[in-house]
Amino acid sequence: MNRERLIPLLNEIAQLLQSNGHPGQAEYISALATVAEWDVTAVEPGLVSGAIWGGSGSVWDVAQFNSREERRRFMHALLRLVDEMRQAGIKAPGAESSAAIMTSWLTSGII
């Protein structure tokens, strides 16, 4: 993975989560950014985890945001994360299905 793109992206996602009242999810993403600073190859298990791409309570599943604009920024950041994972050859079915759903929502204007 490209450390120069991944760490700022993870920090952006964590900041959006924190500023919108999701401290637990923000802490998880911040921890991944810290791991990536030390060893970008060690972050893969965390990136494919259900903590990000799983069901209720996962990072991608948070729904409450201060504005529609912030929620859209959050989803676009997650889509960039999926792109980074693809470029690195990381296979994550949960990420792929979540990306398809978010893309559909963003394209249709639901979000």
Question: What are these model-predicted stretches?
Answer:
Residues 39-75:
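Short, charged early-sequence alpha-helical segments and their helix-coil boundaries
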Residues 3-6, 43, 81-82, 88:
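Solvent-exposed, well-ordered amphipathic alpha-helical segments
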Residues 1-33, 97-110:
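Short terminal alpha-helical segments
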Residues 60-111:
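Amphipathic alpha-helical binding modules
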Residues 19, 48, 52-55, 87, ...:
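Intrinsically disordered, low-complexity segments enriched in small/polar residues
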